[in-house]
Amino acid sequence: VDDRRNVVMLCSEDNRNRIKAAYELTDKNKLTPEQSKLLEDIYTGFVRNGANLSEEDKATFRKLSMELSSLTLKFSQNHLKETNGYELVLHTEDELAGLPESAIEAAAHTAHEKGKEGCWVITLQDPSYVPFMKYSDKREVRKTLYMAYNTQCCHDNEFNNLKIVEQLVNLRMELAQLLGFKNYAEYVLKKRMAEHSENVYKLLNDLLEAYTPTARQEVEEIRALARELEGEDFELMPWDFSYYAEKLKNRKFSLDEEALRPYFELSRVKAGVFGLATRLYGITFKENKEIPVYHPDVQAYEVFDRDGSFLAVLYTDFHPREGKRSGAW
């Protein structure tokens, strides 16, 4: 909706004339750096939203933008629904072998929420998926979960995104070329530090060259440990990597992430982050339970500057749930 509103607003004739006049007639030498940056950003956004195109091309730009907005939303909705719709139900304690108590408790809680009493449910949400792949001794179950996670929206159902991806690629290319760019990458990078796709590829290739020797060494260490534990004929597969990498880390560094969990309880982490922000920037956070929130898990904090003046409201939304995109917000 915001993308559509921006396109309409920036392409309107009155706004086009005002912004263009302000940009061309303003003596930029008399502007502060902040004013100059603001003017440049507004004008650049105005141009990138098709305001300098002919009327016919503007109509095409609006059509492409609307289609891109709709398809992008559909892509995200499909991924969210596919993620939230998946359940790996474990029926016996034997299937829990290797899992830490925290992961078992979380799986039992998820099962309870889904009405599957006496079972354990693993989902594709990261707080459920990641611990299972790290700690589960059940290789075949790890494979099942890995395949489900890495083939999301690729199945023959209503959530398949393959056609949408193809449409997005074609529409983005058409939009970029309409604005005079060679491709969509050039359009995006015009406002980025890299500026050109060649610079991006150079950075990636430099990183690849620098990291490859160490990465290969680490993979060989993990493979060697796996064969030591499972036999010389053992073939390391993608669903094995996290599991044996965790075992190698424990062997080399005696580091158990589960043992660290009590030190990173959510309230402690929030206090630490808020305290750091106060120390660095002088801003403070005060929870206000009177501010309406969109879900009981959400907390609202008023943010104040060092002089006590109000700056903003911060909403925190840390926990996964159905209907929510992955990650802490």
Language-model segments: which ranges?
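N-terminal helix-rich structural modules
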Residues: 1-99
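Short, charged, low-complexity loops and linkers
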Residues: 19-26, 122-129, 147-163
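Acidic, low-complexity proline/glycine-rich segments
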Residues: 24-41, 120-144, 177, 238
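Active-site-proximal, well-structured secondary-structure segments within enzyme catalytic domains
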Residues: 34, 38, 67-70, 77, ...
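A conserved hydrophobic secondary-structure block that centers on an alpha-helix together
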Residues: 41, 50-64, 152-187
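Residues forming anionic-ligand binding surfaces in small-molecule and nucleic-acid pockets
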Residues: 44-47, 141-153, 241-258
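Second-shell loop/turn segments in exported
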Residues: 47, 128-132, 153-158, 189-200, ...
